[in-house]
Amino acid sequence: LQGNENVVGVYPDMIVTYGLPVALAKPTPSQPAEITPWGVARIGGFSDGTGKTAWIIDTGIDLDHPDLNVDQTRGKNFVLKSALPDDDNGHGTHCSGIIGAMDNNIGTVGVAAGATVVPIKVLNRKGSGTYSQIIAGIDYVAANAKTGDAVNMSFGGGVYDPIDQAILNLSAKGVKIAIAAGNEAQDANNCSPARVNGTNIYTVSAMAKGDLWASYSNFSNPPVDYCAPGSSIYSTYKNGSYATLSGTSMAAPHVCGILLLGSITSDGTVIGDPDGNPDPIAESATTALY
C-alpha cells in the first residue's frame, strides 16, 4: 500500500480516549434550580448563543436533555453507524452544557447559552474509540459545518499525524476549534491532537479556582494557547441529569463557547504553570448577560 501513488501513508489504527476525569460527583436529579458555574463566571459570564452551532466530537450528547438545544438531525454516530448519536457515557453531554446549556431557570447555564450543539459520536460508552472513527467524524464536520461554527475536541492520545492533518483541514474551512491539552501532566507536544498549531485552532490547559494551575493538566506554550477553568466543573450529564467533572476536557468547552460568541481575550495568567511560561487565562470579549 505504501508504494501506491494514491496512498499518502499507512498508519496503525490506534485507540483514543477522552482521558479520565480527575473527579466525578454523583449525578444530581434532573431540573434543579439554575446556577452559574464558577467556570462560566470566571471567563466573563454567559451570553446569548441562540442560532450559533457547536459541533461536539465526543461520546455523543443526551439527545433529550431539558437543558440542551441538541440538533440530532445533523448528528452522526461513527461508533455504531446504524444508531443515534446518543450519549451512553456522559462526557460529551457534560462538554455540551459548558458550551451551550440554556438560560432557562433549571440546572446550569453555558458560556454561549442556548447554542445549538451537534453530537458527533466517535467514542463509546467507555470513552474510547479509534483514530479512524475520530478522523471520520472530523471529516464529516469539515463537510457540513459553516464558517463561524465552533468544534470541541476533548480527547487525545499519542502523536498521530493523520488526525493532526484532519484538524488542519477542518480549520481551513473557517471553523474554530477548541482542543483539550490532556490530563497526563506532560508536555502537550507529545499528544495528538493537542499539539496541533494553526489558524482557528486553540489548545487549552486547565486551572482550578483561584487561577491555580491544575496539577493533572498538560503544558507547554506552544501548543497551549489559553488556560481555562477545568476543575470541579458542574454541567449537564447523561439521562437528563447534572454532574461535576474535572479535566482539560472541561477547560476546552469554555474556550469553545467563547469562540462561538466571537473574539477571545485574556484576563491575567494562570498561577503555577510548570513550564515557566504561564498560559493566559481565557476570557470572552463579548458583553455578558451575567
Regions found by a protein language model. Give the residues of each.
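Substrate-binding/specificity loop regions of serine endopeptidase catalytic domains
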Residues: G19-L20, L80, T108-V109, S128-I134, ...
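Flexible, small-residue-rich helix->loop connector segments that border functional cores
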Residues: I57-D67, H94-A115, D139-T147, K209, ...
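Short, solvent-exposed loop/turn elements at domain surfaces
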Residues: L1, L63-V70, D86, G127-S128, ...
